[in-house]
Swiss-Prot record:
SUPFAM superfamilies registered for this protein in UniProt: PR-1-like
Primary subcellular site in the record, as a coarse category: secreted
InterPro entries referenced in this protein's UniProt entry, alphabetically: Allrgn_V5/Tpx1_CS, CAP_dom, CAP_sf, CRISP-related, V5_allergen-like
Organism of provenance: Dolichovespula maculata (Bald-faced hornet)
Keywords from the named record: Allergen, Disulfide bond, Secreted, Signal
Tissues and organs where the protein is expressed, per its UniProt entry: Expressed by the venom gland.
Lineage of the organism: Eukaryota, Metazoa, Ecdysozoa, Arthropoda, Hexapoda
Cystine pairings recorded for this chain: 14-26, 18-111, 36-104, 181-198
Coiled coil: none
Annotated signal sequence range: 1-10
Localization: Secreted
Any Gene Ontology CC annotation: extracellular region
Identification of the protein by name: Venom allergen 5.02
Family classification: Belongs to the CRISP family. Venom allergen 5-like subfamily.
Domain SCP: residue ranges: 55-200
Amino acid sequence: PIINLSFGEANNYCKIKCSRGIHTLCKFGTSMKPNCGSKLVKVHGVSNDEKNEIVNRHNQFRQKVAKGLETRGNPGPQPPAKNMNVLVWNDELAKIAQTWANQCSFGHDQCRNTEKYQVGQNVAIASTTGNSYATMSKLIEMWENEVKDFNPKKGTMGDNNFSKVGHYTQMVWGKTKEIGCGSVKYIENNWHTHYLVCNYGPAGNYMDQPIYERK
């Protein structure tokens, strides 16, 4: 269950500085209800099972890359890593992510940092014509698949085509330690749509840095 922020708590987030924009919890945080216009929201929030699925899926993929078992790339394979942290769930990151997901506006919010660190973000959306929604794993797999366009010979983030690989690189950013996600499932024009927002701390995707230290 997600608890509405008190006015004071939301106000604290208004003091957090980002490179641009007002903090998502300052803007929208006093209501945890979806704000989706004509979209029929069926579920908002992440269940415990889904939370475990998200964390496990991330860590399995991070370990696969860290061990040098990811053969895809442009060119592949991806080199093994020596500093791949094991991600743990963070409720504060999740609360910020859920608040943004609740706006049903596909894309990135402008300001999501915490007092502890700068926060990165991945977003995914998928629609099906059936009566079910794409699973968390299915959405996360879309981020993993971007590895096919990543060139490990260009060591830093900035040398790669960010728009094609940015979700992958945040997923396997070695120094990132925590993750928290928000989710909205809704129906619009008979399409069952699942919108996922994941926040990561400390953030990855610094242009001048390697995505992880190589073995």
